[in-house]
Amino acid sequence: MNYQNDDLRIKEIKELLPPVALLEKFPATENAANTVAHARKAIHKILKGNDDRLLVVIGPCSIHDPVAAKEYATRLLALREELKDELEIVMRVYFEKPRTTVGWKGLINDPHMDNSFQINDGLRIARKLLLDINDSGLPAAGEFLDMITPQYLADLMSWGAIGARTTESQVHRELASGLSCPVGFKNGTDGTIKVAIDAINAAGAPHCFLSVTKWGHSAIVNTSGNGDCHIILRGGKEPNYSAKHVAEVKEGLNKAGLPAQVMIDFSHANSSKQFKKQMDVCADVCQQIAGGEKAIIGVMVESHLVEGNQSLESGEPLAYGKSITDACIGWEDTDALLRQLANAVKARRG
């Protein structure tokens, strides 16, 4: 008797476009490559304590409309230029959404938002948007969720995040060890920082793991380790952005032999998932920075053209410039928040 034991739960397998096809169709322009190189260098200097500016990763929770994303980028670029002496502003350009259960997984996975899962289209749209943003002079940041998409997009990312659900994952630590950009690891969803500290140490070491080449072939990858990794405080069972929390994290980092540097996420559990509270978190963190706290090297903010969020499932037409995932602050608050951060950096300098 013949037993069929393989692919029992697989409905269909489609070929994925090889990375090289996308890299040739949308090659990095000299301007885009220059934007990435300079931003990575600036972030490296901030992490090494050679630049006292604040890294600000700010933008929509997720990208679903490239047109609105480009308008946001144009507005943000003007503020980046204006506040460049105090802030290193990088746009949050998230294409992939880790879900606690199920839901829309982002522009790459389902670009047409209709459960058609045209991933090849998603990769094309994502790379073209990243290219346009970088070409304008605005650097981009993203979250890395798998081992394959970085081959399509990572050359256009100036900073990367590993999320709270994946910080403990071995494959994500291995991936971070080979990424060309600085990487932030979020504390665990329960608020523990040990997983992020372990992740920073792991990603700083060389690794050998499986991935794909630019030609789309399965490959064995050897990395040299990433020395530009840091922790992101995003809250847990309670917020963890206060001066008391920062002091505890600094102590934990020192004990682990790591530099006392933290980035604070104003959203997620730190805002108790209430988007307007990001402004309260900002006020508290600005007070710490203005008071001379040098350990706070960066912040993360969820912001869009229009405040709040909307449901993709409602069947209603989508409002322009409004998030379809986590709720974000609107543009007016964004402008005020960035100026507040810049003033705090000025005060820290005395």
Swiss-Prot record:
Entry keyword annotation includes Acetylation: yes
Pfam families per UniProt: DAHP_synth_1
GO biological process: amino acid biosynthetic process; aromatic amino acid family biosynthetic process; chorismate biosynthetic process
Domain of life: Bacteria
Documented EC number(s): 2.5.1.54
Reaction catalyzed: D-erythrose 4-phosphate + phosphoenolpyruvate + H2O = 7-phospho-2-dehydro-3-deoxy-D-arabino-heptonate + phosphate
InterPro entries: Aldolase_TIM, DAHP1/KDSA, DAHP_synth_1
GO molecular function, one term: 3-deoxy-7-phosphoheptulonate synthase activity
Record's keyword terms, sorted: Acetylation, Amino-acid biosynthesis, Aromatic amino acid biosynthesis, Transferase
Presence of keyword Transport: no
Gene Ontology cellular component annotations, sorted alphabetically: cytoplasm; cytosol
Metabolic or biological pathway, per its Swiss-Prot or TrEMBL entry: Metabolic intermediate biosynthesis; chorismate biosynthesis; chorismate from D-erythrose 4-phosphate and phosphoenolpyruvate: step 1/7
Annotated positions of the N6-acetyllysine modification: 244
Family named by the database record: Belongs to the class-I DAHP synthase family.
NCBIfam families registered for this protein in UniProt: aroFGH, PRK09261.1-1, PRK12755.1, PRK12756.1
Other comment: There are 3 DAHP synthases, AroG is feedback-inhibited by Phe. The other 2 DAHP synthases are Tyr- and Trp-sensitive, respectively.
Role of this protein: Stereospecific condensation of phosphoenolpyruvate (PEP) and D-erythrose-4-phosphate (E4P) giving rise to 3-deoxy-D-arabino-heptulosonate-7-phosphate (DAHP).
Subunit annotation: Homotetramer.
Name of the featured protein: Phospho-2-dehydro-3-deoxyheptonate aldolase, Phe-sensitive
Species: Escherichia coli (strain K12)
